[in-house]
Amino acid sequence: MSTVERYRLVDEWANGVELYDVPSVSCLIDCGRRVPALRTAVRCGDHILTYAELYERLDGGVTGPAGPTLDDLARLLCAIAAAAEIGAVLAELGPEGAGLKPVAVAAAADDRRAVAADQPSCPIDRAYGSADVRLLATRWDTTDAAVELLAALADGATLVLSTATQRTDPAALAELIAVSAPTHVVADADTLAALAFVTAPALPTVRRWDVFGNDCPAALSALLRDLSPGSCTGFAYTAPEYAGVAARGPLDGSGRVRPIPGARLLVLDEDMNLVAPGQSGRVYLGGAALALELDGATEGFVDDPFVPDSRLVRTDAFGGWTADGWLVLEVIESASVAGIPTATPVSVLDVDGYAAA
């Protein structure tokens, strides 16, 4: 392996651009204080919390119950704010035996804001924030929910959180999207793929679909664009050990991604050696939003062999680099198994760029 190739695999391709001027948790929260008090901050089922009610809880006030999900989500937001003040690690977030620093959650929220701003529903008012409605189909007690809520508050948007029934019943999910009229929808591939098996109404308000996880079915993009003409789609690679998204790419079935700012992705063999472009290996993840080990020996965490005093986590994903710097994840076919017609599954060796590697 040449010196240039090695540099690309360890540094140029492996690292997202350096993080710059990431707002703190308190700064993100304070942005929401200028939003009209009666605007809905978060909704789940028949329950809502307005900006006034949510910020009253953040300030230590007492408000009436808003349902178990929103009450718990508000408590989680308060815990994040409190941890940020003293620099504590959030054991509530992250995998077992690890936790997240508030700055990691803030960095993930800042990335989410940048993605949402790429497809605004209307010009953003500097005083009153955004009129976006962002729908998230996941549990309240996940890092994704915390990140999405922080990003929505900072932008003055409304977050709609799906119920357990809506996540598992595609007809209920389609109805939720139609009724809540979101501008952005964030969910895993299986949840959105199920929309193919119901008579879904037109969903013209959705401007962007973000599919997270490690499943990138080719047919899903066409399905979502048919439901929302003029919308765009994106694939976001995530792992439990990393706050928010680690890498992004097109939702085209190839599984190709590049690390987001602050993230680090390496492809290594069983002996922790670099895998050359055109070959497949295990994906290791590190960077600014990596979870911290609470007991010093959490399973899957290893030293970065190329950066002193840095840690990586061994993910469940496999993939390889193309000759032009895309990381191609080996595509998981769970959405295909669910029944969506797809093209032939993609192998990392079939993607343009490997032949030239």
State each model region's role:
Residues 6-13, 98-108, 232-235, 251-357:
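AMP-dependent adenylate-forming
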Residues 2-85, 89-119, 217-221, 261-264:
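AMP-binding/adenylate-forming domain of the ANL superfamily
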Residues 111-112, 116-134, 142-183:
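Conserved AMP-binding/adenylation subdomain of ANL enzymes
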Residues 32, 66, 140, 145, ...:
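Generic structural signal for small/hydrophobic residues in well-ordered secondary structure
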Residues 70-84, 97, 138-155, 167, ...:
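Conserved coil-to-alpha-helix start sites within the AMP-binding
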Residues 149, 154-157, 184-186, 196-254, ...:
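Gly/Ser/Thr-rich phosphate-binding loop
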Residues 30-38, 129, 275-276, 320-325:
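Flexible acidic/glycine-rich loop/turn elements at helix↔coil and beta-strand↔loop transitions
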